[in-house]
Amino acid sequence: MSAKERVVILVVMLMIGGCAMQRPVPPPSTFEVQPLVKEMWTPKADNLVLVLDASSSMAQDYNDFEKFDIGRRMLARFNKTMPDLSINVELRSFGHSLSYSLQSTIPVYGLSPYSRAGVANALSTIVPAGGPSPMGKSLQAVAVDLQGADGKIAMVVVSDGKDMGNTAMDAARELNTQYGNRLCVYTVLIGDDPAGRTLLSEMSQVTGCGQAITADDVDTGAAMAEFVTTVLLDKADSWIFRDIKFESDKAVLMASSYPTLERIIQILHENPELSVEIQGHTDSTASAVYNIDLSQRRAQTVMKYLHDKGIDAARMTTHGYGEGRPIDTNDTEEGKANNRRVELKPLQ
């Protein structure tokens, strides 16, 4: 064998070896986002804190894929699934390669009004994984971040739970002491480390209202939607639409109402199992008897519009409540305008 042939064989062997060492390309995702319709839900938390483990153990593989990639993907799907809520959100990471940050924990998206695009962008910047595992320090920082926050708090911790020591549980207990029944802790295990599973399970029980799951548990759109609901949402008793306007003292829709009505049609088309009661409401300008009749006629006007747009009449009923269920004062013009409204109540 000539020297040239030996060189060619060596190059081929190195190429084969290099290919064998590469991570497999993930198969096409079967995950389909099932977005939750904002109008059908009310937030049960006023603040959402996402904590992502970016330490060196997360750079290890689980089922042939890097755990850190699995964790980031899980949070990205959570972000895509949750409704566009009026809540504050924080994304804090810990660990980090020195090439990303010299700090062991940082608020990548500081506590501020929720922006789906903002959270997605912040999440995409956290690369690569590396460094120690100071979860305890990260949770202590969260306690400080939340000091000015009002209302309920939901915290989702995404980690493999490895190499955390005792400080992580100590910090979780301190958070519970500081925020009490305002706080619920949810944990998502990446991988299958037994000690990590135990740690995250115990952490989720600190507040008495959390849950421990694995990333594998939310690998479908339906499962992720259920988890987002558990963390953030309560079913809305009714959907209030103040943008459905009528001509004064009439049951004739104003043109400004149509965009909102089209949104209702979209919701009903996307949820074909859903039936609704269309509820009409008025202010207190006229007599109570007159307002009952007016509110009923307005509800029927909305029902006719929806039916003409393809919504089965069997899915809809109407009820006029007149002035009897105000959501604002009738002593001001603004309050009266808020009380002149249509609500849709989901029926089981």
What are these regions (language model features)?
Residues 61, 165, 281-348:
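Periplasmic OmpA-like peptidoglycan-binding domain that tethers envelope proteins to the cell wall
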Residues 20-22:
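Bacterial signal peptide processing site
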Residues 1-8:
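Bacterial N-terminal signal peptides that target proteins for export
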Residues 41, 74, 79-82, 246, ...:
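Periplasmic peptidoglycan-binding/anchoring modules of Gram-negative envelope and division proteins
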